[in-house]
Amino acid sequence: MTVNSQRHSVLLDNVYSLIDKKVDAQQKSLVQQFGRLLYKNISNDDLENRNDSDLYGATLSLWSGLAKFKSTAPYIRVFNPEIEKHGWHSSHTIVEIIVNDMPFLVDSVRMSLNRLNITAHLFLHSPIAIKRNDKAQVTAFAEPGKTLEGTRKETVIFIEVDRQTSKSDIETLTKELHSVVDEVSLAVADWQDMTGKLQTVIKDTAKFNWPVSAAHKKQTKTFLEWLSDHNFTMMGYRYYEVKAIEGDHRWIPANDTSLGLLKNSINDRERLLSKLPASAREEALSDHPLILTKTNSRSRVHRPAYMDYVGVKVFNKDGNVVGEHRFLGLYSASFYNMSVTQLPILKEKVQEICALSGFEPGTHAFKAFENIVETYPRDELLQTPADELAQIVMGIFQMQERGISRLFIRKDVFGRFFSCMVFVPRERYNTQLRKETQALLKASLGAKEEVEFTTFFSESVYARTHYIARVKDNNAEYDVKEIEKNIIE
């Protein structure tokens, strides 16, 4: 044991001694056990420059919160501890959260701090098996790795964040945390119902009258089955009825079917298809059984990506769209890590665009073309029509290793963004060029916010950066060659 480790061990022992001296005899053993569970994973670095009295105060403060916690509502407290008022001090603002244990909680809380540009200087969290009596008082803790009859897991979170000096800042953070915990609770509470709904949809596909070939129906059903096999994190579900009216269509939400996060928009109103761009109207009423796209908003649960939207269309016997089962969530890591040749729907699309290339299978050209597809952004592979994707991939292939710069732009069919793929020689790529390209795309395409980017390096001589320019309407006119010229210059 190092000198620092010994000192930190003594520091925590002093905390437990203070509990022994100051806490009521009937509770002190429980409070000591709670402290050991709370600090069992704290690092030596996190204990540096701390004193036993403040750690004791933090422990007692959380213990008090644990006593107040009722399983029906989360306990969330944000405050600046003061010696005179709380008996202990911290130079940071303290966040205490106690909730029933659930998935995604810690990631979602971290995301909420990041959205507010608040840094966490200490983040302790632990699911603890707690036994309470009929008055909700804590009576026992199960030791890690051991079971104790009558316990329920509760997650205790203690965070030290940048000091929030104003009352409004503290209120904003508190409100944000309540909102996030509520969203996590909604998604987790309805998870089983949402996965059950997907299973029902899979069983009922024969009733949906999809006006496509038997092979296409099989591919679609296989994809939905793959999603249900833990490859899609469910966040929300709702059914929409589609009614044709004179010269238009209405998407009518069946709000009583809402599950998960879509319960937050329970009063969602019906929408006219005519309000959408022409490409979106065409997609919504097309023969394609599925709508695969992204939502307009980032997930506040699990990871901060734009949520994935899987719409399963229902047709009548005349081949007209009459309904949609809408699932919102996030594709799991397997979607991004598995080979495209193993992913339902994508593997068929890859086969189609490789066939469109005209290259003979097994040739060097075919393998090079196939490799471009394999390493292409997965979301783009899924959302881009096969014929358009084949043209883009052929354009990339034709660049070969010539050291030129190229820009490829795809319009989102729902009119919400431009997807821009920029290839530049690796030796040219740097942060300054990336920032200049972001500014150029924002101005040229009329983006309403900062252009997002993801850069990919491979063995190629090129650096590939995928930019997303979010707009109110992507029908704006633009000149790809002119933008490309400005990037080169």
Task: State the predicted function of each range.
Residues 74, 120-126, 405, 448-456:
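Short beta-strand elements
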Residues 109-110, 114, 433-446, 487:
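Short, non-transmembrane amphipathic alpha-helical segments
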Residues 1-90, 94-96, 111, 126, ...:
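Charge-rich interaction surfaces and accessory domains that mediate macromolecular binding and assembly
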Residues 97-99, 420-429:
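A short interface-forming secondary-structure element
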Residues 69-72, 116-119, 397-403, 442-449:
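Short secondary-structure junctions
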Residues 125-135, 451-464:
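Short connector loops at secondary-structure junctions
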Residues 102, 106-107, 111-143:
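Well-ordered mid-protein domain cores that form the structural environment of catalytic cofactors
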Residues 131-163, 466-467:
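Extended charged low-complexity segments that act as oligomerization/scaffolding linkers
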